[in-house]
């Protein structure tokens, strides 16, 4: 079956959602040789994935993940496709902490660095924040601390079947886009950083089919897969089955536009140091504004505020009042979660 679908791709034809789901199921179950996986990933990257293919691939990944039920907690995820090559500090991770300090329930999905200098798991280790290892720990952390970190390999063990091939290929594949759409909690409220507006549009259409509630897909024109504090950001907003596209600049919400170099770090350790100084109100303004903008997005999609600008005000207050730093200290304490068990 896989070979027939591969031949279909070679003929330049696209796959239906059902066919894409079948391909992903076979890949996730270790039924496909590495050479054939490489072939289909290369073909799809060259011609671009269709919305139906993305929908099917996401369903296939979800069929094979270790899911966690957090529907009653109404969680939000802040996750990016990664690979922007900008070597910035972990903006989405810092933003998740701020949003959780502001009362948003966050289930942050992430991994170690692949092409970047610091993955979300790497910086959390340097911040001494405990990474939960099972469903009970995750539920307790979200309920008691408003935040849990979902380390992707624990919930997507079947990805081991493509890890070596992805590394050998050395370029972005559909899996970069699929990761943020396959949160183990099946959350429907997200902020997803992507590397291009074209991809954002495709993912938005796929998210409508997959049942998203409220999602912001963001692509900074400076190349960041975040809401940019240094340039204009293209935004594709999904609310139910309604898709809206617009741009956002820092000055639109009364924030100063900064320089990209103010966001660059050497490694996970320096990323953690910048985040800690930011929460102590000692960082540069650009770093602070980057976190404010992305925190505001998470607060907005959570439904805790009605507009993005209201989210900015809440994020600013959360950082400047010291609430974000207090939350950081709470997240560092394993005893809070362990006691809840």
From Swiss-Prot:
Recorded metabolic or biological pathway in which this protein acts: Amino-acid biosynthesis; L-tryptophan biosynthesis; L-tryptophan from chorismate: step 2/5
Leader sequence segment: none
Residues the entry annotates as binding Mg(2+) 1: 92, 226
UniProt cofactor(s): Mg(2+)
Residues reported to bind anthranilate 1: 80, 111
Positions in coiled-coil regions: none
Catalytic activity: N-(5-phospho-beta-D-ribosyl)anthranilate + diphosphate = 5-phospho-alpha-D-ribose 1-diphosphate + anthranilate
Residues annotated to bind anthranilate 2: 166
Positions that bind 5-phospho-alpha-D-ribose 1-diphosphate: 80, 83-84, 88, 90-93, 108-116, 120
Co-factor binding comment: Binds 2 magnesium ions per monomer.
One of the protein's GO biological processes: L-tryptophan biosynthetic process
One Gene Ontology cellular component: cytosol
UniProt keyword terms in alphabetical order: Amino-acid biosynthesis, Aromatic amino acid biosynthesis, Glycosyltransferase, Magnesium, Metal-binding, Transferase, Tryptophan biosynthesis
Positions with a binding annotation for Mg(2+) 2: 225-226
EC number: 2.4.2.18
GO molecular function, one term: magnesium ion binding
Family designation: Belongs to the anthranilate phosphoribosyltransferase family.
Subunit structure: Homodimer.
Function of the molecule: Catalyzes the transfer of the phosphoribosyl group of 5-phosphorylribose-1-pyrophosphate (PRPP) to anthranilate to yield N-(5'-phosphoribosyl)-anthranilate (PRA).
Protein name, as recorded: Anthranilate phosphoribosyltransferase
């Amino acid at each position: 079956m896989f070979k027939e679908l591969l031949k279909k791709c070679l003929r330049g034809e696209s796959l239906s959602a059902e066919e894409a789901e079948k391909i992903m199921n076979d890949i996730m179950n270790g039924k496909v040789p590495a050479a054939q996986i490489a072939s289909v990933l290369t073909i799809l990257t060259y011609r671009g994935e269709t919305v139906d293919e993305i929908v099917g691939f996401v369903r296939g990944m979800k069929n094979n993940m270790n899911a966690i039920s957090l529907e009653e907690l109404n969680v939000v995820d802040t996750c990016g496709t990664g690979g922007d090559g900008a070597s910035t500090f972990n903006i989405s991770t810092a933003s998740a902490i701020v949003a959780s300090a502001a009362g948003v329930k966050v289930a942050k999905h992430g991994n170690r660095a692949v092409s970047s200098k610091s993955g979300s798991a790497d910086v959390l280790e340097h911040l001494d924040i405990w990474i939960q290892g099972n469903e009970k720990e995750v539920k307790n952390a979200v309920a008691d601390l408003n935040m849990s970190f979902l380390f992707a390999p624990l919930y997507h063990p079947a990805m081991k079947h493509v890890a070596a091939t992805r590394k050998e290929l050395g370029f972005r594949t559909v899996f970069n886009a699929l990761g943020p759409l396959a949160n183990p909690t099946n959350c429907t409220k997200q902020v997803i950083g992507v590397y291009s507006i074209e991809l954002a549009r495709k993912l938005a259409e796929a998210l409508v089919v997959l049942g998203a509630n409220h999602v912001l897909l963001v692509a900074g024109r400076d190349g960041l897969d975040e809401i940019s504090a240094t340039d204009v950001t293209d935004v594709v907003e999904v609310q139910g089955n309604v898709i809206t596209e617009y741009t956002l600049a820092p000055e639109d919400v009364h924030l100063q536009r900064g320089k990209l170099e103010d966001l660059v770090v050497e490694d996970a350790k320096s990323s953690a140091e910048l985040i800690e100084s930011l929460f102590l109100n000692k960082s540069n303004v650009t770093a602070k504004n980057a976190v404010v903008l992305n925190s505001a997005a998470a607060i907005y999609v959570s439904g805790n505020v009605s507009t993005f600008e209201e989210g900015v005000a809440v994020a600013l207050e959360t950082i400047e009042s010291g609430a974000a730093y207090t939350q950081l200290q709470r997240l560092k304490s394993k005893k809070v979660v362990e006691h809840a068990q």
